[in-house]
């Protein structure tokens, strides 16, 4: 069985990779310029997601160093997946302090580490981020995030 990165290398060499949609960087915080490897992570995910041969359910792992921008990539992928029809996202981590920092980054527009642009606009519609305790209270036209931790 081939590793995904081997398939991605083959696809890239043969011109099959997806481009980063403009709406992703346009809706992320302009203070966080995407680095080349982050753009590649987006392109790899989108290429894999759009492949008719991808396994379902789809599970991916971003193996990246601390401080490399994984959470920013997750914010951008939520935008991409929203456009694909997804509305509900579970952010699950092992430590309470990490989940609190993550909430701040996703929800507090006044934070210097806020991940999104001042306004999130997809296809001319303003989208907001909605924190939920469970998806029973999810909003139909929002990015609904349930933050959870194994620590309770």
Regions found by a protein language model. Give the residues of each.
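RecA-like P-loop NTPase motor core of helicase/translocase proteins
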Residues: 1-152
């Amino acid at each position: 069985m081939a590793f995904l990165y081997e398939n991605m290398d083959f696809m890239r060499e043969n011109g099959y990779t997806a481009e980063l949609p403009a709406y992703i960087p346009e809706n992320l915080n302009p203070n966080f310029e995407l680095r080349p490897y982050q753009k590649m992570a987006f392109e790899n995910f989108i290429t894999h997601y759009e492949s008719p041969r991808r396994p379902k359910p789809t599970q991916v792992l971003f193996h990246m160093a601390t401080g490399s921008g994984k959470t920013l990539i997750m914010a951008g992928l939520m935008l991409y997946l929203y456009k694909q029809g997804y509305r509900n996202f579970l952010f699950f981590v092992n430590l309470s302090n990490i989940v609190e920092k993550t909430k701040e980054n996703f929800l507090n527009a006044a934070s210097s580490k806020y991940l999104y642009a001042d306004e999130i606009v997809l296809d001319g519609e303003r989208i907001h981020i909605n924190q939920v305790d469970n998806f029973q209270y999810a909003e139909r036209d929002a990015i609904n995030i349930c933050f959870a931790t194994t620590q309770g």
